Regions:
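Metal-ion/cofactor- or nucleotide/acyl-coenzyme-handling active-site neighborhoods
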Residues: 2-404
Protein backbone atom coordinates (compact mmCIF):
# COMPACT_ATOMS: atom_id res chain seq x y z
CA UNK A 1 0.00 0.00 0.00
CA UNK A 2 2.93 2.33 0.74
CA UNK A 3 4.39 1.83 -2.73
CA UNK A 4 0.97 2.37 -4.33
CA UNK A 5 0.48 5.60 -2.38
CA UNK A 6 3.95 6.82 -3.33
CA UNK A 7 3.29 5.91 -6.94
CA UNK A 8 0.00 7.82 -6.89
CA UNK A 9 1.71 10.87 -5.42
CA UNK A 10 4.41 10.69 -8.09
CA UNK A 11 1.81 10.54 -10.84
CA UNK A 12 -0.03 13.54 -9.37
CA UNK A 13 3.21 15.53 -9.18
CA UNK A 14 4.04 14.62 -12.76
CA UNK A 15 0.61 15.76 -13.95
CA UNK A 16 1.00 19.07 -12.09
CA UNK A 17 4.40 19.65 -13.70
CA UNK A 18 3.03 18.88 -17.16
CA UNK A 19 0.06 21.20 -16.65
CA UNK A 20 2.31 23.98 -15.38
CA UNK A 21 4.64 23.60 -18.35
CA UNK A 22 1.62 23.65 -20.62
CA UNK A 23 0.42 26.90 -19.06
CA UNK A 24 3.88 28.45 -19.44
CA UNK A 25 4.06 27.30 -23.05
CA UNK A 26 0.67 28.83 -23.88
CA UNK A 27 1.62 32.10 -22.23
CA UNK A 28 4.86 32.16 -24.23
CA UNK A 29 2.83 31.72 -27.39
CA UNK A 30 0.62 34.62 -26.39
CA UNK A 31 3.59 36.91 -25.98
CA UNK A 32 5.39 35.84 -29.15
CA UNK A 33 5.32 38.12 -32.17
CA UNK A 34 4.78 35.05 -34.35
CA UNK A 35 1.32 34.38 -33.02
CA UNK A 36 -1.79 36.51 -33.52
CA UNK A 37 -2.94 36.72 -29.95
CA UNK A 38 -2.26 39.61 -27.62
CA UNK A 39 1.20 40.49 -28.82
CA UNK A 40 2.35 41.87 -32.16
CA UNK A 41 0.20 40.86 -35.10
CA UNK A 42 1.32 41.14 -38.67
CA UNK A 43 -0.52 43.53 -40.93
CA UNK A 44 -3.05 42.05 -43.38
CA UNK A 45 -0.85 43.60 -46.09
CA UNK A 46 2.44 42.20 -44.90
CA UNK A 47 2.65 39.86 -47.88
CA UNK A 48 2.56 42.74 -50.36
CA UNK A 49 5.20 44.87 -48.70
CA UNK A 50 3.31 47.97 -49.78
CA UNK A 51 2.08 49.25 -46.42
CA UNK A 52 3.83 52.20 -44.81
CA UNK A 53 4.52 51.99 -41.10
CA UNK A 54 6.00 54.47 -38.63
CA UNK A 55 9.59 54.09 -37.55
CA UNK A 56 10.79 55.04 -34.08
CA UNK A 57 11.83 58.53 -35.20
CA UNK A 58 8.48 59.16 -36.89
CA UNK A 59 9.52 58.63 -40.50
CA UNK A 60 7.46 56.36 -42.76
CA UNK A 61 9.07 53.25 -44.17
CA UNK A 62 7.80 50.38 -46.26
CA UNK A 63 6.82 47.30 -44.33
CA UNK A 64 9.24 45.10 -46.31
CA UNK A 65 12.07 47.54 -45.47
CA UNK A 66 11.06 47.36 -41.81
CA UNK A 67 11.01 43.56 -41.82
CA UNK A 68 14.51 43.43 -43.30
CA UNK A 69 15.96 46.12 -41.05
CA UNK A 70 16.46 44.93 -37.50
CA UNK A 71 17.46 48.44 -36.40
CA UNK A 72 14.06 49.91 -37.27
CA UNK A 73 11.37 49.66 -34.64
CA UNK A 74 7.85 50.24 -36.04
CA UNK A 75 5.74 52.18 -33.58
CA UNK A 76 2.53 50.60 -34.85
CA UNK A 77 4.09 47.17 -34.39
CA UNK A 78 4.60 47.60 -30.67
CA UNK A 79 2.89 44.95 -28.52
CA UNK A 80 -0.54 46.00 -27.37
CA UNK A 81 0.12 44.44 -23.97
CA UNK A 82 3.21 43.11 -22.24
CA UNK A 83 3.81 39.66 -20.80
CA UNK A 84 2.45 40.41 -17.32
CA UNK A 85 -0.79 41.70 -18.80
CA UNK A 86 -0.99 38.66 -21.05
CA UNK A 87 -0.87 36.44 -17.96
CA UNK A 88 -3.77 38.41 -16.46
CA UNK A 89 -5.75 38.17 -19.68
CA UNK A 90 -5.15 34.45 -19.91
CA UNK A 91 -6.16 33.90 -16.28
CA UNK A 92 -9.00 35.28 -14.22
CA UNK A 93 -7.40 38.58 -13.24
CA UNK A 94 -9.01 41.60 -14.88
CA UNK A 95 -6.89 44.39 -16.32
CA UNK A 96 -8.63 47.36 -14.70
CA UNK A 97 -6.17 50.12 -15.56
CA UNK A 98 -4.75 50.88 -19.01
CA UNK A 99 -1.37 49.16 -19.39
CA UNK A 100 1.64 51.36 -20.29
CA UNK A 101 1.90 49.61 -23.66
CA UNK A 102 -1.66 50.63 -24.54
CA UNK A 103 -1.04 54.20 -23.42
CA UNK A 104 2.19 54.38 -25.41
CA UNK A 105 0.50 53.01 -28.52
CA UNK A 106 -2.38 55.49 -28.29
CA UNK A 107 0.02 58.38 -27.65
CA UNK A 108 2.20 57.39 -30.61
CA UNK A 109 -0.77 57.24 -32.95
CA UNK A 110 -2.07 60.58 -31.75
CA UNK A 111 1.35 62.21 -32.04
CA UNK A 112 2.34 60.81 -35.42
CA UNK A 113 -1.03 60.71 -37.15
CA UNK A 114 -3.39 57.94 -38.21
CA UNK A 115 -5.60 57.15 -41.22
CA UNK A 116 -7.85 54.29 -42.29
CA UNK A 117 -5.95 51.58 -44.18
CA UNK A 118 -8.51 50.83 -46.90
CA UNK A 119 -6.57 47.88 -48.33
CA UNK A 120 -6.31 46.24 -44.92
CA UNK A 121 -9.99 46.94 -44.28
CA UNK A 122 -11.03 45.21 -47.50
CA UNK A 123 -8.95 42.15 -46.73
CA UNK A 124 -10.22 41.93 -43.17
CA UNK A 125 -13.83 42.59 -44.20
CA UNK A 126 -13.63 39.76 -46.73
CA UNK A 127 -12.26 37.36 -44.11
CA UNK A 128 -14.91 38.36 -41.58
CA UNK A 129 -17.80 38.23 -44.04
CA UNK A 130 -16.75 34.83 -45.39
CA UNK A 131 -16.71 33.46 -41.85
CA UNK A 132 -19.85 35.12 -40.49
CA UNK A 133 -22.10 36.02 -43.48
CA UNK A 134 -23.24 39.20 -41.77
CA UNK A 135 -25.21 40.57 -44.71
CA UNK A 136 -27.34 37.42 -44.86
CA UNK A 137 -27.46 36.30 -41.24
CA UNK A 138 -27.06 39.29 -38.92
CA UNK A 139 -30.82 39.84 -38.61
CA UNK A 140 -33.42 37.09 -38.16
CA UNK A 141 -35.70 37.40 -41.22
CA UNK A 142 -38.47 35.49 -42.91
CA UNK A 143 -35.96 34.54 -45.59
CA UNK A 144 -33.31 32.99 -43.34
CA UNK A 145 -35.66 31.67 -40.62
CA UNK A 146 -38.86 30.20 -42.11
CA UNK A 147 -41.58 28.51 -40.06
CA UNK A 148 -40.47 25.20 -38.49
CA UNK A 149 -36.78 25.97 -39.00
CA UNK A 150 -34.58 24.68 -36.18
CA UNK A 151 -31.97 27.20 -35.03
CA UNK A 152 -29.33 26.96 -32.33
CA UNK A 153 -29.03 29.35 -29.40
CA UNK A 154 -25.93 31.53 -29.51
CA UNK A 155 -24.77 31.24 -25.89
CA UNK A 156 -25.82 27.73 -24.88
CA UNK A 157 -26.41 24.32 -26.35
CA UNK A 158 -29.78 23.42 -27.77
CA UNK A 159 -32.12 24.69 -30.45
CA UNK A 160 -35.49 26.38 -30.81
CA UNK A 161 -38.10 26.15 -33.54
CA UNK A 162 -39.40 29.10 -35.55
CA UNK A 163 -43.09 29.26 -34.67
CA UNK A 164 -45.78 31.24 -36.45
CA UNK A 165 -45.49 33.88 -33.73
CA UNK A 166 -41.75 34.27 -34.22
CA UNK A 167 -42.13 34.29 -38.00
CA UNK A 168 -44.72 37.07 -37.82
CA UNK A 169 -42.31 39.13 -35.71
CA UNK A 170 -39.45 38.75 -38.18
CA UNK A 171 -38.68 41.39 -40.79
CA UNK A 172 -39.23 40.19 -44.35
CA UNK A 173 -35.65 41.18 -45.18
CA UNK A 174 -32.86 42.87 -43.28
CA UNK A 175 -32.70 46.64 -43.82
CA UNK A 176 -28.91 46.31 -43.85
CA UNK A 177 -28.54 43.57 -46.47
CA UNK A 178 -27.89 45.80 -49.47
CA UNK A 179 -26.56 48.85 -47.66
CA UNK A 180 -23.00 50.08 -47.39
CA UNK A 181 -22.49 53.22 -45.33
CA UNK A 182 -19.47 55.43 -45.88
CA UNK A 183 -18.97 56.01 -42.16
CA UNK A 184 -20.52 54.54 -39.02
CA UNK A 185 -20.23 55.76 -35.45
CA UNK A 186 -20.57 53.15 -32.72
CA UNK A 187 -21.13 54.95 -29.44
CA UNK A 188 -20.54 53.18 -26.15
CA UNK A 189 -21.61 54.62 -22.82
CA UNK A 190 -18.27 55.05 -21.07
CA UNK A 191 -17.76 58.00 -18.77
CA UNK A 192 -14.83 58.79 -21.05
CA UNK A 193 -17.36 60.63 -23.24
CA UNK A 194 -18.28 63.13 -20.50
CA UNK A 195 -16.66 66.42 -21.46
CA UNK A 196 -15.19 64.92 -24.64
CA UNK A 197 -16.88 67.29 -27.07
CA UNK A 198 -17.28 64.38 -29.54
CA UNK A 199 -20.94 65.01 -30.37
CA UNK A 200 -20.33 66.60 -33.76
CA UNK A 201 -17.85 63.91 -34.79
CA UNK A 202 -20.34 61.21 -33.83
CA UNK A 203 -23.21 62.85 -35.71
CA UNK A 204 -21.12 63.27 -38.89
CA UNK A 205 -21.51 59.55 -39.59
CA UNK A 206 -24.02 58.15 -42.07
CA UNK A 207 -25.15 55.53 -39.55
CA UNK A 208 -25.02 55.84 -35.75
CA UNK A 209 -25.32 52.84 -33.41
CA UNK A 210 -25.85 53.15 -29.65
CA UNK A 211 -26.19 50.62 -26.86
CA UNK A 212 -28.66 49.77 -24.09
CA UNK A 213 -31.14 52.61 -24.62
CA UNK A 214 -28.82 55.46 -23.53
CA UNK A 215 -30.06 58.90 -22.59
CA UNK A 216 -29.53 60.87 -25.81
CA UNK A 217 -30.75 64.16 -24.37
CA UNK A 218 -29.73 67.81 -24.97
CA UNK A 219 -27.69 67.86 -21.75
CA UNK A 220 -25.18 65.45 -23.32
CA UNK A 221 -25.46 66.68 -26.92
CA UNK A 222 -21.97 68.20 -27.14
CA UNK A 223 -20.37 64.97 -25.93
CA UNK A 224 -22.47 62.18 -27.49
CA UNK A 225 -24.39 63.78 -30.35
CA UNK A 226 -28.09 63.48 -31.10
CA UNK A 227 -28.53 61.06 -34.01
CA UNK A 228 -29.32 57.34 -33.62
CA UNK A 229 -30.18 54.90 -36.40
CA UNK A 230 -29.93 51.66 -34.43
CA UNK A 231 -30.00 51.11 -30.67
CA UNK A 232 -29.61 47.86 -28.74
CA UNK A 233 -31.54 46.81 -25.67
CA UNK A 234 -31.80 43.82 -23.37
CA UNK A 235 -34.46 42.49 -21.02
CA UNK A 236 -32.93 44.10 -17.95
CA UNK A 237 -32.91 47.54 -19.57
CA UNK A 238 -36.48 47.21 -20.85
CA UNK A 239 -37.78 46.51 -17.33
CA UNK A 240 -35.45 48.47 -15.05
CA UNK A 241 -35.26 51.65 -17.09
CA UNK A 242 -39.05 51.99 -17.33
CA UNK A 243 -39.98 50.28 -14.03
CA UNK A 244 -42.71 48.04 -15.46
CA UNK A 245 -43.25 45.06 -17.74
CA UNK A 246 -43.68 46.07 -21.41
CA UNK A 247 -47.37 45.14 -21.58
CA UNK A 248 -48.33 47.53 -18.74
CA UNK A 249 -49.79 50.94 -19.58
CA UNK A 250 -47.33 52.83 -17.31
CA UNK A 251 -44.48 51.19 -19.23
CA UNK A 252 -45.98 52.32 -22.55
CA UNK A 253 -46.22 55.92 -21.31
CA UNK A 254 -42.67 55.88 -19.93
CA UNK A 255 -41.24 54.35 -23.09
CA UNK A 256 -43.08 56.82 -25.34
CA UNK A 257 -41.71 59.76 -23.35
CA UNK A 258 -38.22 58.29 -23.51
CA UNK A 259 -38.09 57.77 -27.28
CA UNK A 260 -39.54 61.24 -27.83
CA UNK A 261 -37.09 62.97 -25.47
CA UNK A 262 -34.14 61.07 -26.94
CA UNK A 263 -35.17 61.55 -30.58
CA UNK A 264 -35.53 57.78 -31.10
CA UNK A 265 -39.02 57.72 -32.63
CA UNK A 266 -37.92 56.05 -35.89
CA UNK A 267 -34.77 54.32 -34.64
CA UNK A 268 -34.39 50.58 -35.27
CA UNK A 269 -34.27 48.64 -31.99
CA UNK A 270 -31.89 45.67 -31.99
CA UNK A 271 -32.63 42.75 -29.64
CA UNK A 272 -30.99 39.39 -28.93
CA UNK A 273 -33.94 37.21 -27.91
CA UNK A 274 -32.38 33.84 -28.64
CA UNK A 275 -29.02 33.89 -26.90
CA UNK A 276 -30.38 31.47 -24.30
CA UNK A 277 -33.64 29.72 -23.52
CA UNK A 278 -36.39 31.69 -21.86
CA UNK A 279 -35.93 35.14 -23.39
CA UNK A 280 -37.90 34.69 -26.59
CA UNK A 281 -41.41 35.29 -25.26
CA UNK A 282 -40.33 38.40 -23.35
CA UNK A 283 -38.93 40.07 -26.45
CA UNK A 284 -41.90 39.03 -28.56
CA UNK A 285 -44.18 40.66 -25.95
CA UNK A 286 -42.02 43.79 -26.15
CA UNK A 287 -42.21 43.90 -29.92
CA UNK A 288 -45.97 43.29 -30.00
CA UNK A 289 -46.51 46.02 -27.39
CA UNK A 290 -44.73 48.56 -29.58
CA UNK A 291 -46.77 47.56 -32.61
CA UNK A 292 -50.10 47.56 -30.75
CA UNK A 293 -49.47 51.03 -29.32
CA UNK A 294 -48.47 52.64 -32.59
CA UNK A 295 -44.73 53.04 -32.14
CA UNK A 296 -42.86 53.57 -35.40
CA UNK A 297 -39.75 51.72 -34.25
CA UNK A 298 -38.88 48.54 -36.11
CA UNK A 299 -37.52 45.78 -33.90
CA UNK A 300 -34.69 43.79 -35.45
CA UNK A 301 -34.11 40.39 -33.86
CA UNK A 302 -30.58 39.06 -33.97
CA UNK A 303 -29.97 35.72 -35.67
CA UNK A 304 -28.27 33.67 -32.92
CA UNK A 305 -26.28 31.55 -35.34
CA UNK A 306 -24.62 34.70 -36.65
CA UNK A 307 -23.53 35.71 -33.18
CA UNK A 308 -22.10 32.26 -32.64
CA UNK A 309 -20.14 32.52 -35.91
CA UNK A 310 -18.74 35.87 -34.83
CA UNK A 311 -17.67 34.37 -31.48
CA UNK A 312 -15.98 31.49 -33.29
CA UNK A 313 -14.21 33.89 -35.67
CA UNK A 314 -12.68 35.85 -32.81
CA UNK A 315 -11.88 32.71 -30.82
CA UNK A 316 -9.75 31.56 -33.75
CA UNK A 317 -8.03 34.95 -33.56
CA UNK A 318 -7.24 34.53 -29.87
CA UNK A 319 -10.22 36.27 -28.24
CA UNK A 320 -11.79 33.68 -25.96
CA UNK A 321 -14.60 34.75 -23.65
CA UNK A 322 -17.95 33.25 -22.61
CA UNK A 323 -20.02 35.80 -24.54
CA UNK A 324 -18.96 38.87 -26.53
CA UNK A 325 -20.48 42.14 -25.40
CA UNK A 326 -23.10 43.70 -27.63
CA UNK A 327 -20.61 46.49 -28.27
CA UNK A 328 -17.85 44.26 -29.59
CA UNK A 329 -20.38 42.17 -31.48
CA UNK A 330 -21.82 45.23 -33.24
CA UNK A 331 -18.35 46.49 -34.15
CA UNK A 332 -17.77 43.14 -35.84
CA UNK A 333 -21.06 43.36 -37.71
CA UNK A 334 -20.53 47.00 -38.70
CA UNK A 335 -17.29 46.10 -40.45
CA UNK A 336 -19.44 44.32 -43.05
CA UNK A 337 -21.84 47.16 -43.86
CA UNK A 338 -19.71 50.23 -43.07
CA UNK A 339 -16.70 51.33 -45.11
CA UNK A 340 -15.17 53.17 -42.16
CA UNK A 341 -16.01 52.30 -38.55
CA UNK A 342 -15.41 54.89 -35.82
CA UNK A 343 -15.73 53.73 -32.20
CA UNK A 344 -16.46 56.15 -29.35
CA UNK A 345 -17.02 55.57 -25.63
CA UNK A 346 -15.43 52.11 -25.45
CA UNK A 347 -13.11 52.14 -22.42
CA UNK A 348 -13.03 49.25 -19.91
CA UNK A 349 -10.68 50.84 -17.40
CA UNK A 350 -11.20 52.71 -14.15
CA UNK A 351 -8.87 55.55 -15.18
CA UNK A 352 -8.40 57.46 -18.43
CA UNK A 353 -5.20 57.95 -20.44
CA UNK A 354 -4.01 60.57 -17.95
CA UNK A 355 -4.79 58.59 -14.81
CA UNK A 356 -8.03 60.36 -13.92
CA UNK A 357 -10.95 58.32 -12.56
CA UNK A 358 -13.58 57.38 -15.15
CA UNK A 359 -17.20 56.50 -14.45
CA UNK A 360 -18.56 53.39 -16.13
CA UNK A 361 -21.37 55.40 -17.79
CA UNK A 362 -21.33 59.05 -18.76
CA UNK A 363 -24.77 59.30 -17.13
CA UNK A 364 -23.27 58.34 -13.72
CA UNK A 365 -25.28 55.14 -13.50
CA UNK A 366 -24.73 54.03 -9.91
CA UNK A 367 -25.85 50.48 -10.67
CA UNK A 368 -22.54 49.92 -12.49
CA UNK A 369 -19.82 51.62 -10.46
CA UNK A 370 -17.34 48.78 -11.01
CA UNK A 371 -16.88 49.49 -14.71
CA UNK A 372 -18.52 46.20 -15.62
CA UNK A 373 -15.33 44.34 -14.79
CA UNK A 374 -17.08 41.93 -12.43
CA UNK A 375 -19.44 40.65 -15.13
CA UNK A 376 -18.07 37.18 -15.72
CA UNK A 377 -20.12 36.72 -18.87
CA UNK A 378 -17.84 39.21 -20.60
CA UNK A 379 -14.15 40.08 -20.73
CA UNK A 380 -14.27 43.69 -21.87
CA UNK A 381 -10.56 44.11 -21.18
CA UNK A 382 -9.72 41.39 -23.69
CA UNK A 383 -12.11 42.92 -26.20
CA UNK A 384 -10.53 46.34 -25.85
CA UNK A 385 -7.06 45.01 -26.58
CA UNK A 386 -8.40 43.44 -29.75
CA UNK A 387 -10.01 46.76 -30.71
CA UNK A 388 -6.65 48.43 -30.10
CA UNK A 389 -5.04 45.97 -32.51
CA UNK A 390 -7.63 46.81 -35.17
CA UNK A 391 -7.00 50.51 -34.55
CA UNK A 392 -3.26 50.08 -34.83
CA UNK A 393 -3.73 48.28 -38.15
CA UNK A 394 -5.98 51.00 -39.61
CA UNK A 395 -9.12 48.84 -39.68
CA UNK A 396 -11.22 50.84 -37.19
CA UNK A 397 -10.78 54.22 -35.55
CA UNK A 398 -10.81 53.99 -31.76
CA UNK A 399 -11.45 57.40 -30.20
CA UNK A 400 -10.12 57.50 -26.63
CA UNK A 401 -9.51 61.20 -26.13
CA UNK A 402 -11.42 64.44 -26.45
CA UNK A 403 -12.51 65.61 -29.89
CA UNK A 404 -12.10 69.33 -29.23
Amino acid sequence: MGRQAASAVSVCLLVCVVVSLGQMWRISLLSSVRFHRWGVTSSPLSATGSQLVLSENGSRVKLDDFNNNSNTKAVYGNPVVNNSDIIKLYGNTRVVRPPPTILQLLDNIQRLGWTFNDSAIEIFRSQLENATRTREQFILTQQNAPVNASIGFSAQNGKFTITERIFDAEQETSPLTDRTFATCSLVGNSGLLAGSGCGREIDKADFVIRFNMPSVIPHWRDDIGTRTHLVTTNAHTIVSKFHHQPHNLPWVHAFRNFVRNCNLQTTHIFTLPFNVRGNGDFFLDFQETLKTNGFENKVLMNHPEHRRRVSEFWARDGLNEPTPTSGFYLVSAALSFCKHVRVFGFWPFLTDRRGRAVEYHYTLNYLHRDGGLTNWNHRIDREFFKLAELYRDGIIELVTDSCG
